[in-house]
Amino acid sequence: DPAILQGFNDLILQQNIPAVVAAMEISSPINYVGNINARKAPVYFSNNWDDDLFKPNSILDMFSQLTGPKHLDLLAGIHMSAEISGLLGLPGLPWDNVHSWFDYWLKGINNGFMSQPAVTMAVKHTSDTTTFASWPSSTVATKTFYLGPRAFNPSGKGTLNNSANLVSFTDAILSGLDTLATSGQVPVIAQLLEPVVPITVSMSAISVVNGIVYQSGALSSGIKLRGIPKLNIWITPSLAQAELVVYLYDVDSTGTGTLITHGPVSLHSATPGKTIQLSMELTATAWDVPAGHRLAIAIDTYDPLYSVPTLSLYTVGFPLSAGKQSVLTVQYVN
């Protein structure tokens, strides 16, 4: 399709973006939820946690808006990796469920599929699954961590705290070089292998010049993350264009962080030197952080998975004070 090719080229060259978005809106199924609901059409979703083409966040959003019969499986892997077994003639959960779905809705076979919970989430790096009767779910709670400044902390890290920050300080990072915080050194390959080869980093090795880390204390009871982590953060970019990539880590007693999820945000028309508040989502996840481990976020300005909005050097300040609270919120189950 020439229109799709033109849109792809425009994205690469960062031009005609409003026109690209408008063109893509036409083919986005979330814009037809009203029609689907009016027909009460049954909808089955299968999606993977690290799918960078169809993020689970958007799937969860659409799923939550549907009012008719629906089912969602969120599995480990990247785009199509959980489904590829069926293409090879091998068994797999998505294909088994698709057959059961069609048997029920097209053949009228009462196979009990619709009596199952509507949402199944594979817990990353385990063989466990979590089920929910619906999404959003009343069984999912939210926990807030308040960012505390790095300032002159001997550890070189900021903090994630249970109570509001009362210290006034502005930390800053410089663009131009990547840090060891990454979604994977080799895009696609790293994400493909991630279910069996976790992406890890020594948290103390993340550059304090080009990145910043905020870390919690040891968690006394652990936490079972289920859903979408969100970061509301105050920043001061020195240029109109900038990029931030936020990584969420499970940090063990040795200081090694295992990547849980991440999320990027690009600025294209900021006012240089003006402090703004960013609200961003990280990619949805299901992850069990053991007791005694810590949660941490690392922030830098580059990741090999994403193009950058500018090649010029810039700084990003992170002002914190009693009047400017930056917070990380995570969804979890007991």
Spans of features found by a protein language model:
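Accessory cap/linker subdomain of secreted extracellular hydrolases
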Residues: 1-38
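Short beta-strand/loop motif that positions the catalytic acidic residue
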Residues: 39, 44-47
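Acidic beta-to-alpha connecting loop that harbors the catalytic carboxylate
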Residues: 49-51, 77, 302
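Catalytic histidine neighborhood in serine/cysteine hydrolases
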Residues: 66-81
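Short, conserved loop/helix-junction motifs that constitute active-site signature segments
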Residues: 36-39, 65-67
